[in-house]
UniProtKB/Swiss-Prot annotation:
It comes from Mycobacterium marinum (strain ATCC BAA-535 / M). Transmembrane segments: none annotated. It catalyses: phosphoenolpyruvate + GTP + H(+) = enolpyruvoyl-2-diphospho-5'-guanosine + diphosphate. This is Phosphoenolpyruvate guanylyltransferase. It comes from the Bacteria. GO terms for biological process: F420-0 metabolic process. The gene is fbiD. Belongs to the CofC family.
Length: 217
């Protein structure tokens, strides 16, 4: 049994894909230096993993990343880590990384959820409720708070067929995935911009993100 959960009672494998920290969240540049952005991204990942780890339906959590710091943090929190083999210059690196992880994770669980790694305000119960709702559909997704992106993609007994990228919410909808309509404000609040971070902080972020943001403000 690998992954962040050790009891083996769940039937869902969670995947989080993380790019190199130095290339992440460039739209936070108006409020954070490059080094500070790396710290913020890592802290958000840690808070996301910590909240997700308490979801009883999860058998495992897998982080796929080319970044050594992200891999080390995920390992310390008990997640399975896969080295992202996606080549530099790949035209679709995020979806290809997810597909690589899906090939591995699907060997041990029948159901897979892909979650963004920048959800510092996500509550455990929000993710648990979304997974419960997703069980009614082969493929489903949770849109972000703006309705244009995707916070989570769920596949129950089906291939993921990830469509992340610009306007991913519409792309997932067109691909046949059902949009889940629960409120789940923390689950929907991924952080790409200063406005996103302000929204997450208004909901209440996890301790790692709170510490790092306070240190760099």
């Amino acid at each position: 049994m690998s992954g962040i959960r050790a009891d083996g009672t769940g039937d869902v494998g969670l995947i989080i894909a993380v790019k190199r920290l130095g290339a992440a969240k460039t739209r936070l540049a108006p409020v954070f230096s490059a080094a500070a952005r790396e710290s913020v991204v890592l802290a958000m990942l840690m808070d996301t993993l910590t909240a997700a780890a308490r979801v009883g339906d999860l058998r495992s959590i897998t982080v796929i990343t080319p970044d050594e710091s992200a891999a080390a943090a995920a390992t310390e929190l008990g997640a399975e880590v896969l080295a992202d083999p996606t080549r530099q210059g790949d035209p679709d690196p995020l979806n290809n990384a997810i597909l690589t992880a899906e090939q591995v994770v699907s060997g041990s669980v029948p159901n897979i959820v892909v979650l963004q790694g920048d959800l510092p305000a996500m509550q455990t119960q929000e993710l648990a409720d979304a997974i419960c709702a997703a069980r009614a559909h082969q493929r489903s997704f949770v849109a972000d708070r703006l309705g244009t992106g995707t916070a989570a993609l769920c596949a129950f007994g089906s291939a993921l067929d990830p469509q992340f990228g610009p306007d991913s919410s519409a792309r997932h909808r067109r691909s046949g995935a059902v949009e889940l309509t629960g409120a789940w404000p923390g689950l929907r609040c991924d952080v790409d911009t200063p406005a996103d971070l302000a929204a997450a902080r208004s909901l209440g972020v996890g301790p790692a993100t709170a510490r790092v943001v306070a240190h760099h403000r």
